[in-house]
Regions:
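Hydrophobic alpha-helical segments
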Residues: 1-188
Length: 188
């Protein structure tokens, strides 16, 4: 059952078209991603999600590759095909030395790709916090100290956790709207 229609540029209100223009300009893309077009019926919802995406995923101190790997891990573990596809493609584009097998191993916690040593630690911690939020209450798990030990500042820890929060929200949204993916992942 299709739960959402995508609002194409030519069918969008002038306010949504302005947001689409900003999105395409910021992302350097000639098109708007489907999950954003699914929100094209409501400029307030679109602007809210776009602002979160821009501030959390596109901008910031944390390397884009690490953010995409976190988003991929949360999405694949959660079983979200749209976000797995989107972030898998993004990660492979950011680091052409990575393979689909590397990403699959990463989702199982066994990645041997040539990543900075802090990346797998951050990916595991943030994905656990995102997928099992009550786990942060465990008195034996001091995830902040673990991240600091890997060289992350308090500001970077906040940003990492924000990526985790964003991933949960986007997985829920794209599943609820049944957003069609731009291209399958792994690539066919």
């Amino acid at each position: 059952m299709k739960r959402s229609t995508l609002v194409e540029y030519e069918d969008a209100s002038s306010e949504v078209q302005l947001l689409y223009d900003e999105i395409m300009d910021t992302m350097g893309s000639p098109k708007v991603l489907n999950f954003l077009k699914a929100l094209g019926h409501n400029p307030h919802a679109l602007r809210g999600v776009w602002t979160m995406l821009k501030e959390t995923v596109i901008e910031g101190e944390i390397p884009a590759l690490l953010k995409q790997l976190i988003l991929f891990k949360v999405s694949i573990v959660a079983g979200n095909r749209y976000c797995t596809s989107l972030h898998g493609h993004a990660a492979l584009n950011l680091d052409p030395t990575l393979t689909y097998d590397d990403l699959e191993a990463l989702s199982g916690g066994t990645c041997t790709a040539n990543l900075p040593p802090s990346f797998p630690v951050a990916i595991e911690i943030v994905s656990r916090a995102a997928l099992e939020p009550k786990s942060v209450e465990d008195p034996d798990w001091d995830f902040e100290d673990q991240l600091r030990d890997e060289g992350f500042s308090d500001s970077e820890i906040d940003e990492l956790l924000a990526v985790g929060f964003f991933s949960v929200m986007m997985n829920m949204m794209t599943d609820t709207y049944d957003v069609p993916w731009e291209s399958p992942f792994p690539p066919e």
